[in-house]
Design a protein with these regions (language model features):
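Acyltransferase
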Residues: 68-126
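Pocket-forming structural segment of enzyme catalytic cores
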Residues: 1-69
Length: 126
């Protein structure tokens, strides 16, 4: 899971979600946020999971994941999963675990995606 911060901007983007489980696969990340960015969420694997900058949202996780997308990603020729699993076992799961978790968390992921996408669309109506 990621820890959604208590900032008003975090509530705007994430609604009532506090510790949502999201698809994250980390072995690389940025260390500093842009000037003026609002830090919205973090996790042990990635300190800067999400930030907002003006009307924009930056996420280092996937809310668009589905079992079919996961299957496509895992079937990609030359994929880097075996090396990443060996080098980053705390934040990169084996394919079997990714498939099972995707199916288990699909409904919650779709609900969170609806909240985030609705907040994003509201910025363009404005």
């Amino acid at each position: 899971p990621i820890a959604v911060h208590e900032a008003p901007a975090a509530r705007t983007w994430f609604g009532d979600a506090r510790l949502p489980t999201v698809y994250q696969w980390h072995y690389d990340s940025f260390v500093e946020m842009p000037a003026g960015a609002q830090w919205l969420a973090s996790s042990p694997a990635c300190a800067h999971q999400t930030f907002a900058l003006g009307i924009h949202l930056a996420m280092q996780f996937h809310i668009e994941i589905t079992p079919d997308k996961m299957a496509d990603w895992l079937a990609e020729p030359g994929n880097v999963y075996p090396d990443a699993i060996a080098r980053y076992p705390d934040s990169v799961q084996p394919p079997e675990a990714m498939r099972a978790a995707t199916a288990r968390h699909q409904a919650d992921s779709e609900a969170l995606a609806d909240v985030i996408y609705s907040a994003w669309r509201a910025r363009w109506r404005g």
